[in-house]
From Swiss-Prot:
Organism classification: Bacteria, Pseudomonadati, Pseudomonadota, Alphaproteobacteria, Rhodobacterales
Entry EC number(s): 3.6.1.23
Keywords assigned by UniProt, alphabetized: Hydrolase, Magnesium, Metal-binding, Nucleotide metabolism
One Pfam family, short name: dUTPase
UniProt protein name: Deoxyuridine 5'-triphosphate nucleotidohydrolase
CDD domains from the UniProt entry: trimeric_dUTPase
């Protein structure tokens, strides 16, 4: 059974913009759009190189218990313009009910304009497993041990 994510729009949101949606039958991520406040819609938001901005979606969501939503960059924006998410993936917990915003960062060399209605990120609905943490006297040995950050090679 597919989980249902309930969505409401902010009072100021543009209702002509579609809800998050999957562009293809095999898509894992549903596209999120910039839903800018009325006073910003005409000019959009300009993101300077190395700048960050919180882009509103005009939405709030209710995620079913046992699930999370991950906010991820769109590969085309990253490749063509250097636009990414500094906290990728961003995690939205099932008990959060506040506004859904997307933090964008411009890693490119040129200013980037976010227009009202642009697809700016994708959201992936994923199951959550909550672990139990236990204090231990030691950890089991492995071939890797404490090696990290490139310890297994790069080739």
């Amino acid at each position: 059974m597919r989980p249902v994510v309930r969505v409401i729009r902010e009072d100021w949101a543009d209702t002509a913009l579609p809800l998050p949606g999957y562009e293809t039958a095999g898509a894992a991520g549903a596209d999120l759009r910039a839903n800018l406040p009325p006073e910003s819609r005409a000019e959009g938001l300009v993101l300077a190189p190395l700048g960050r901005v919180l882009v509103p979606t005009g939405l709030r969501i209710e995620i079913p218990d046992g699930f999370e939503v991950q906010i991820r960059p769109r590969s085309g924006l990253a490749l063509k313009h250097g636009i990414s998410l500094p906290n990728s993936p961003g995690t939205i917990d099932s008990d959060y009910r506040g506004p859904l915003g997307v933090i964008l960062v411009n890693l490119g060399d040129e200013p980037f304009r976010v227009a009202h209605g642009d697809r700016i990120a994708q959201m992936v609905v994923a199951p959550v497993v909550q672990a139990r943490f236990e204090l231990a006297d030691g950890l089991g040995a492995t071939a890797r041990g404490a090696g990290g950050f490139g310890s297994t090679g790069t080739a």
